[in-house]
């Protein structure tokens, strides 16, 4: 699936476009060849959540950095499914915690999108970088705020990310969460001190963005002192 470029104007915060922009890099994994090598078996095991297979082929010499046709490693496949056990196995086996897919999606971004807070925490503990951006210029926090939810956001904030950091087009995490109607994420961000008065490069606040995307309850929660 191609990734739609996030434009300016009201369509920027449209729920559909945000979902496409976030979800496209996380498409389905490639099918394994009919006579899979150890590396292919590693990818299949990670995709299917088969810890025993992952551990077996790693011990037999599978390369942790092996990638499928989308450039996804076994660590990314495990992270986007929130499979902490396989994430642990891959890290123990020497996987690069920041190796990205062809779309620039890192394991941390994949876990953040999935809302897999335990995996986010484990990747951060392993040294995953929070400031890396994908080919659409989105860091892990945008994946968490736009889709992953409060627990993933909280894990990222605990690593020291500024709650009011502005990303592409001046959008903060609060604005992304508001545009997607992520009420729990909005409440969490406000509780962590996110500013309601900040504006994106169109002059819109998070509450304005929530209204544009018809998330009126979220807009009200943001506007409420």
Summary of predicted features, one role per range:
Residues 13-24:
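Bacterial N-terminal signal peptides
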Residues 190, 196-225:
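Leucine-rich solenoid repeat scaffolds
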Residues 2, 27-60, 69-72, 92, ...:
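Intrinsically disordered, low-complexity regulatory segments in ankyrin-centric signaling systems
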Residues 50-58, 83-91, 116-124, 149-157, ...:
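Ankyrin repeat structural motif
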Residues 44-49, 77-83, 110-116, 143-149, ...:
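Ankyrin repeat A-helix N-terminal signature
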């Amino acid at each position: 699936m191609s990734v739609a470029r996030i434009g300016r104007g009201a369509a920027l915060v449209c729920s559909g476009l945000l979902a496409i922009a976030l979800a496209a890099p996380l498409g389905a994994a490639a099918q394994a060849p009919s006579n899979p090598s150890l590396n292919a078996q590693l990818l299949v095991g990670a995709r299917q959540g088969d810890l025993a297979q992952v551990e077996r082929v790693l011990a037999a010499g599978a390369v942790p950095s092996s990638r499928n046709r989308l450039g996804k490693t076994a660590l990314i496949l495990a992270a986007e499914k929130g499979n902490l056990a396989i994430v642990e196995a891959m890290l123990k086996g020497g996987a690069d915690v920041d190796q990205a897919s062809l779309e620039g999606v890192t394991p941390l971004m994949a876990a953040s999108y999935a809302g897999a807070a335990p995996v986010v925490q484990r990747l951060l503990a392993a040294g995953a970088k929070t400031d890396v951006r994908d080919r659409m210029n989105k860091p892990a926090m945008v994946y968490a705020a736009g889709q992953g939810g409060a627990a993933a956001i909280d894990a990222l904030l605990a690593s020291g990310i500024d709650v009011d950091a502005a990303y592409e087009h001046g959008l903060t995490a609060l604005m992304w969460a508001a545009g997607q109607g992520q009420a729990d994420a909005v409440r969490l961000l406000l509780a962590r001190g996110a500013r309601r008065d900040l504006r994106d490069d169109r002059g819109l606040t998070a509450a304005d963005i929530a209204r544009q995307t018809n998330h009126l309850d979220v807009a009200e929660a943001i506007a409420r002192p």
